[in-house]
UniProtKB/Swiss-Prot annotation:
GO terms for molecular function: translation initiation factor activity. InterPro entries: IF2/IF5, TIF2_bsu_arc, Transl_init_fac_IF2/IF5_dom, Transl_init_fac_IF2/IF5_N, Transl_init_fac_IF2/IF5_Zn-bd. This is Translation initiation factor 2 subunit beta. eIF-2 functions in the early steps of protein synthesis by forming a ternary complex with GTP and initiator tRNA. The gene is eif2b. Heterotrimer composed of an alpha, a beta and a gamma chain. It comes from Pyrobaculum arsenaticum (strain DSM 13514 / JCM 11321 / PZ6). The keyword Chaperone does not apply.
Amino acid sequence: MDKEYLALLERAYTLVAPKAQRRTEIPKIQVENMPRKTIIPNFGAIAKRLNRDIYFMAKFFQKELAVPGTVEGDVFTLHGEKSPKVVEAVYERFIRYYVVCPVCNSIDTELRKEGRVFVMKCLACGASTPVKPL
């Protein structure tokens, strides 16, 4: 009986653990500097992984960095040279404000607009938290 239980428990851990690990991984941002431009080639993949609208993320970056930008497919281009450290700091701020659940610290959240307010709903613990508007 104990061996059977341990075998089933081990099987359950092998099935569940990979999914739990994926939820906690925050993708790294890639920043490329060109003359008078800053390009983020993996912007679309990041938006998809974080379960956020790519244009919502782009609007946040444009407001925080005070430069215009364009989204072409999965690539986001800022029209102005910005240091990779500055762009990474803005990315971390976006994650803190609009991705991480303040109750359980999970990144498995979704952003909804309820009336005129954005609400972050955690899919892990079920908490709903209003977030500041853009």
